[in-house]
């Protein structure tokens, strides 16, 4: 009744942002991996508003003879997940694989993902082995994965690795979702009936620097928290109750101590009062920040603006054409 359809065509979706150094090698290795599949295939490169010559290299690759590369040019930078969603809207395969352009996740792993998906899985995730990232990146990744596992209840080990495979019905369902803050691996797992993970190699970044700065990682954390669950709002209410009870109890204690020990003792407790006050004020600001994040995302969803604007799509052996903005 739930048998998965056979995979006849594979689409590889790769967001690109200022990756001119790695693009030639990326295209060569991804093409070689796809040619070994024994299935129809296509590669979709999405330029996410690069300021270098990435777009020109992509267009050139699409216009070569016997090319299987579709180049999608966004008019500015919208972020990794928005760029991937733009690629999803143009795929024609039965199985869609996402891959980063930095070559830290080797394209040579693509046949393994296809083979695993052929076993009937809706989503095939990956777990990076012997990660070649900084200690900060590794620590942040562990915190994010733990947060996701606790809030979703799905114990997948590496949500941060974008080398993943999705069956077409999962992609079509995600495209019908219109929330502005989208984290694709989590969204896919919400709709997947069968999901699994396989270990993959992880290499050092050969060209350029990571596009995820400290502030972008912080923004990603906020996106994850607010798009996953309303639990922080409930925890905020609980925290407020605990603080209120603690503050009231402390006030009663201070009054009793003042009556018992005299005003001299109370004067010496001024700094403790300030510490307590600042603690309460800090808790209030944290709560206001969380509420603001939720309200801001609701505001963006209500406006229903497109996630991105596709400026051009270059198909193999075709001329560029301009498209309207796409949801």
UniProtKB/Swiss-Prot annotation:
Name the catalysed reactions.
UDP-4-deoxy-4-formamido-beta-L-arabinose + di-trans,octa-cis-undecaprenyl phosphate = 4-deoxy-4-formamido-alpha-L-arabinopyranosyl di-trans,octa-cis-undecaprenyl phosphate + UDP
Keywords in UniProt for this one?
Antibiotic resistance, Cell inner membrane, Cell membrane, Glycosyltransferase, Lipid A biosynthesis, Lipid biosynthesis, Lipid metabolism, Lipopolysaccharide biosynthesis, Membrane, Transferase, Transmembrane, Transmembrane helix
The stretches that face the Cytoplasmic side, renumbered to this chain, are 1-235, 291-327
A cellular-component GO term for this protein? plasma membrane
**What's an example Gene Ontology biological process for this entry?**
response to antibiotic
Q: What is its EC number?
A: 2.4.2.53
Identify this protein by name. Undecaprenyl-phosphate 4-deoxy-4-formamido-L-arabinose transferase
Q: Recall the taxonomic lineage recorded for the source organism.
A: Bacteria, Pseudomonadati, Pseudomonadota, Gammaproteobacteria, Enterobacterales
